[in-house]
Every structure is written in C-alpha cells, then in structure tokens.
Amino acid sequence: MRSKFKDEHPFEKRKAEAERIRQKYADRIPVICEKVEKSDIATIDKKKYLVPSDLTVGQFVYVIRKRIKLSPEKAIFIFVDEVLPPTAALMSSIYEEHKDEDGFLYITYSGENTFGSI
C-alpha cells in the first residue's frame, strides 16, 4: 500500500525528521499510522506517533482504537508491511525488523483483515 505521508513529504525531509526524533527521544519510536485506503473504518486524526519502545503491539492497537473512537464490538487490524504483527510483540522489535529506509515505522489499520496473518 502506498503511504500518503510518503507522497506528501520528500524522502530527505522524512529521513532528517526521523533522525532528529531518534536523537532527541532515543527510547521512542517514530511511527506513521494510516488507514488502509478502501477500509470503511474511521480515519485517524493524526498520523505521526512517538511510541515508547517497550509498548506492545496490543497496547498500540488500544491507542489507535481510542483515537478513532472505535466501539468495543468492532474489530481493528493493524499491518506492518501488509502482515499482522503479533499482539505481544514489542514495538521496538517490530521497528528494528520493519523500519523504512527513512527511519519511520509505517503501520496501516483496517476494520477488516485485508491481507492475512503470518
């Protein structure tokens, strides 16, 4: 999936911003979170997050649910490189495995399991 954030910001600018963030906040992970294009789930109010490195994927999903005001009975799926990451995985390990060459971790979310699991 193509990232709107990548389309709107040139690579050099994104890379410089991610480096600045990592220097200033060494224990945090720069994350870009965007909705899967064709999903009918609500659009999130902000794309950029500074996530504590010891946060789990499940805790991050909880943050996203709150930001889009998703009711408890509705499902949400998050994807990294079009794969569902394990809920118990630490964001720091996901970042190390999947960070983009610009230094950001790109996460997409959807109301349906559009890609499948590992």
Swiss-Prot record:
Modification note: The C-terminal Ser-117 and Ile-118 residues of ATG8 are removed by ATG4 to expose Gly-116 at the C-terminus. This Gly-116 forms then a thioester bond with ATG7 (E1-like activating enzyme) before being transferred to ATG3 (the specific E2 conjugating enzyme), in order to be finally amidated with phosphatidylethanolamine. This lipid modification anchors ATG8 to membranes and can be reversed by ATG4, releasing soluble ATG8.
Q: Where in the cell is it found?
A: Cytoplasmic vesicle, Cvt vesicle membrane; Cytoplasmic vesicle, Autophagosome membrane; Vacuole membrane
Q: Membrane topology type, per the record?
A: Lipid-anchor
Where a lipid (Phosphatidylethanolamine amidated glycine) is covalently attached, the residues are 116
Q: Which UniProt keywords apply?
A: Autophagy, Cytoplasmic vesicle, Lipoprotein, Membrane, Vacuole
The Gene Ontology biological process terms listed for this entry are: autophagy
InterPro entries membership: Atg8-like (IPR004241), Ubiquitin-like_domsf (IPR029071)
Please describe what happens when the gene is knocked out: Blocks autophagy. Leads to reduced conidial germination under starvation. Especially, leads to reduced CP15 levels in conidia. Also exhibits enhanced sensitivity to oxidative stress. Impairs growth of the mycelia on host cadavers and considerably weakens virulence.
Q: What Pfam families is this protein classified in?
A: ATG8 (PF02991)
Indicate the residues removed as propeptide on maturation.
117-118
The site (Cleavage) lies at: 116-117
Please give the CDD domains that the UniProt record associates with this protein: Ubl_ATG8
- Keyword Transmembrane belongs to the record: no
Q: Which GO terms describe its cellular component?
A: autophagosome membrane; Cvt vesicle membrane
Keyword Lipoprotein in annotation: yes
Oligomeric and partner information: Conjugation to phosphatidylethanolamine (PE) leads to homodimerization. Interacts with ATG1, ATG3, ATG4, ATG7 and ATG12.
Protein family membership: Belongs to the ATG8 family.
* Protein task: Ubiquitin-like modifier involved in cytoplasm to vacuole transport (Cvt) vesicles and autophagosome formation. With ATG4, mediates the delivery of the vesicles and autophagosomes to the vacuole via the microtubule cytoskeleton. Required for selective autophagic degradation of the nucleus (nucleophagy) as well as for mitophagy which contributes to regulate mitochondrial quantity and quality by eliminating the mitochondria to a basal level to fulfill cellular energy requirements and preventing excess ROS production.
Name of the protein described by the UniProt record? Autophagy-related protein 8
Lineage summary: Eukaryota, Fungi, Dikarya, Ascomycota, Pezizomycotina
